[in-house]
Amino acid sequence: MRFKKIIFLIILILLQGFSLSLASFAFHRVVSVYDGDTVLLKNGAKVRYLGINTPEIDHEGNKSEFMAHTAKDFNQKLANGALVRLEFDLEKKDRYKRVLAYVFLQNGDMVNALLVRKGLAYVISIRPNLKYRDLLLECQRKAIKESVGIWSNLLRDKGENCLGNRRSYRFHRPDCHFAMKISQKNLIKFRSIYDAFWEGYSPCKRCRPTVSR
């Protein structure tokens, strides 16, 4: 009886893996674009692009971040009405119940990477979802070199020192509350914001090291 249960569990696990594999080859229709990195599918799923972050659009009448509407427009041009394939990492949803995915067009292009390459998004690495970190970072470095999109403005001041956390891939102002909590083994010092972005670290949302004081 115990042997049969083990066999049953093995078959169940294999079937779940097979169904996930099939899901990764299915295409879904995008019916709406919220902003540069979030879309709505026809099946009702709200999808947040994994591994990247685009400038925030303010929906309360205040000023949106630099290039926010350009990022949304480009995302709309690529994805709105398109059939897309979702590829998942280790986590499938975030705390807001949004589906986390790398989104591929029918021609094989990854929307996440296209946004980064155009300089309309930066790499944001959140463990354990690091499957395409290297690819996205390669796209980011090319965009930085060419000073396109957000990089034409974001890296204007390259000289400010900042502290990075190897565990979270975030960088902070030296006086940030979170910077002071970084353990020595995870602490990395950057000579500039430029260096932090070049290594694939993203800015702390509390101390906002990319914003001039």
Describe the residue ranges of each PLM region.
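Small beta-barrel nucleic-acid-binding modules, primarily SNase/OB-fold domains
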Residues: 2-213
